[in-house]
């Protein structure tokens, strides 16, 4: 077998008949599969052992040779080779066709490749292939010219002969008529009898004339057709064609079906065709030019590769190995078989029938019909349903053809190559394990035993609890007591991977150290739930065991949960204490007045704890405690002679002192109430300033304290805790009066219906807000629900408002707001009518969520596909370019404050140019920008920075570490080999389900630009580079505007400053203008409200501006939903969208006009041309949507496994594409290690050697006295170096 690690590229091409025959191990001649009596394969059938190999290991068909000792022998009786049965998975056969057939992919695909090559319309092509028209394959022009006059004379002679015959026939008939009339007259017949005779004679004569004229016309037609006959003409009139063939058969050849095409392809001159097409492109315009360009692409594909166009017509069909289209016996003696077998049987049956008809010399029409049926059978085998009605099996189900085997989610690519199942895995329900450390998980004993079975068995043998592996296996299966001891020894320090589906980002699979637990549920640390998005309502998780030492090392170093504290999307901690822990810490750090022990002083924390235990001190009482090792805050009053490290009297509460015990020793004393915001700031700070180990320990301590005090806080909820605001009725009455007034104005006709709606909505929104404010003021702070909401543990004021205040305005099914509010709260209970109008929104919400999940998953899939080959390949690409970004904004008093978007823009990047303040370099280029550095710069008055960005990176493949900046997940500069493309796709896709789906309708005049697309559809629209609905034009020139009214709408006319031609922009009356008459506009300025078309931005303002536009617009959507994603992730995707250039002028290069090429290749080719003194080609940057960009990738494997599988493979085979295997998907498909992370050669080619100390420790021998072993002398304690030690020598015994 071919080893996957020994090739660098994978090429796909068109197989010729010779190729198919060389792959084959024999011809399949019969449609039989297996004998239903003996259940053995039939000879020469679709499962024949002689062709495909034996069905049993080392055993021939007739049973003469059995056992492995006959390996390789071919039985002389049955002709079967004695070998392993698994060769039936790799040996192919073939069917020799009695007539050639075309490959449906090349004839029926869009565009038809055969049609482009031969310049035939697909309809005409179909007529030829399916025997509805003849095609001329060759014309002997010389002979025709040479014999032209004699042929013409021959035709003239024939015509004259016909004329002469006609004249003589008419004459004879006239004579007969005269005789008849004379006879009748003699008999004295009546005049009408005579008239009838005359009329019938005249009719006959007219018919003779007509027949002769028709014959003459036919001769003329035949001659005209022959005279102008040229290669590739189609002739649908069979009679005419036959007559032509009879007369002038020496001068031309023609035919129908695939055979005619095959003949044409053999004589097709590719080079001449390419030359004439180039000429057309150079001189032609419009439609002709575009068609010539498309045709040239196909023609040059055949010219430049080893492919021959004859490969598109098949003389024999390959038969795939039988084990890939199996036939299995079911219980009832019936057989289940793969659809392919049925399709192959149709082909073989029709082929055999055609052979027989040809042998019998059947009439042409019957043979042609059989050939057409054979063509259809082969079409159905390759791609059933592509042409005409699909072939159906039992129950009218279309049969699955070879193409269907590859296509779609259930196809070979996505189901088997990219979605493999793995061994050493198990799954179970999860429960919480609050006693675990951050890097641990609880693994049920039975699961652990099954997963680590091989390890346990080996260890049992090593410790000689079992004689051999077999008895060890028996011991494990019987679960002997000693097995459990061995198991706990085996799993120490052997991490396992836990994964929860759906794995939306890389934190969905993490490594933990297993702790054996009783029961059958996996226990999970509460802090990693956020990363897994897990809860304990019946979720399940999967466990995987890393086997090799390398896999274990990677799991421990890269995947251990305590090393994955930061979220790759924004670089902020993901292991945040939540819910109970927050309420516990809030309870711990709150301060209360008038409680036991207030105002006391304690000499130490221990003393205060003692007082607390004696019930003399309340946890939240304000007291003074003398603490040691405190890091004071700026707000604390310090004694004059105090130094760092001295004891300090702190005004605090016992709870806060205990809370500070959980934090690192040198952390600033926290003397405030700790709610969710505060806690999040503390954890952020820890992650930024302390090593991972310290952070993990602190988080565990916070978790312990949180749960401990949450239990003791006695947080409960009862219906009495839901307090209704006291002034609710009064508030509602005032607003009711206002609403009544508006209604009256409407009824009097003073305002329109839209205005009434709008005003009512505003009134009731205000009312709802007032009730909410009243509620917030009226609720006592020690109320448990109030504490839950204000601490940030669960719920928000809006939910509170609905529970205790009023539900407010609701939307109808169309998404418009109903102008009557729901005045009741859930505490009071809703009326039937109110309940009914609330159901619309609830139902829509559920439907929305279901749709959103699917859409978001598909978006993630497309993002991954477009960015999967973006890997950090080098340390620095050496560019000087970068993007300028703001880091500060001015307050009203002129002072600077940190810009709101620094978190997602400048943070974690590399500085591109030195920062200079007053001539002094404050920060050199190449510095990493963290929180501390940015704050320092803002203090120095720096407002914006030029930073490195992926968009300006000049690496040829992937990107470089400096342009990418910090890896957000590790907080350090990104490692070479990091798959930043996948991380980016996951970071954008993972919060996709949180985005809304709705297009908001506020109904009426409130909406500014019609319906703005928001949420997920907007993100998709941007990444697919679609023109948005109701897009706003942007000015192409700088100049003054004037607005003109037309009968259809309005138009904005811009008069350029440089006196060029005026530019007009038609806009509808509904669009809100952003300019007035006489406004001065700049290039690229928006003229009306609405979304801008990114393609226009690219055309008018260039690639850099469109990149910034896309990043900002995507961020706009995510920010509006409160999702924080770093710009660099979006930049990675946008960079992939603008990676290609469309060639406009070819000039001296080899690039074809209209071709899409990667910018790197375009620049390389131009450099080559210029070095040779030629003229470089010109191109324009192209903005491609992510789907299109994925399909345009250099890797055909990746594109085929993404979408439109058959189309991608058709193209790739025709162009003889070679896959460089640079991305991740391609390597997963062929089973290589991915070229990212530790799969890169720079990490693979490493030797591990122990240090001297390690060697000494490992091999040291205890010294022994010379008394014990006198003859040896004193032991040196020196280890024997391994390489000098010969295990095989006899003296070793």
Swiss-Prot record:
Keywords of the record: DNA-directed RNA polymerase, Magnesium, Metal-binding, Nucleotidyltransferase, Transcription, Transferase, Zinc
One Pfam entry name: RNA_pol_Rpb1_4
Annotated binding of Zn(2+) 1, by residue: 60, 62, 75, 78
Enzyme class: transferase
Cofactor requirements of the protein: Mg(2+); Zn(2+)
Entry-linked Gene3D superfamilies: 1.10.132.30, 1.10.150.390, 1.10.1790.20, 1.10.40.90, 2.40.40.20, 2.40.50.100, 6.10.250.2940, RNA polymerase II, clamp domain (4.10.860.120)
UniProt GO cellular component terms: DNA-directed RNA polymerase complex
Cofactor note: Binds 1 Mg(2+) ion per subunit.
Top-rank lineage group of the source organism: Bacteria
Residues annotated to bind Mg(2+): 535, 537, 539
Any one biological process term the GO annotation gives: DNA-templated transcription
One annotated GO molecular function: magnesium ion binding
Enzyme Commission identifier(s): 2.7.7.6
Positions annotated to bind Zn(2+) 2: 877, 953, 960, 963
Catalytic activity of the protein: RNA(n) + a ribonucleoside 5'-triphosphate = RNA(n+1) + diphosphate
Protein family according to the UniProt entry: Belongs to the RNA polymerase beta' chain family.
Matches recorded under PANTHER family: DNA-DIRECTED RNA POLYMERASE (PTHR19376), DNA-DIRECTED RNA POLYMERASE SUBUNIT BETA (PTHR19376:SF54)
Function of the protein: DNA-dependent RNA polymerase catalyzes the transcription of DNA into RNA using the four ribonucleoside triphosphates as substrates.
Binding partners and assembly: The RNAP catalytic core consists of 2 alpha, 1 beta, 1 beta' and 1 omega subunit. When a sigma factor is associated with the core the holoenzyme is formed, which can initiate transcription.
Identification of the protein by name: DNA-directed RNA polymerase subunit beta'
Organism of origin: Kineococcus radiotolerans (strain ATCC BAA-149 / DSM 14245 / SRS30216)
Gene this protein is translated from: rpoC
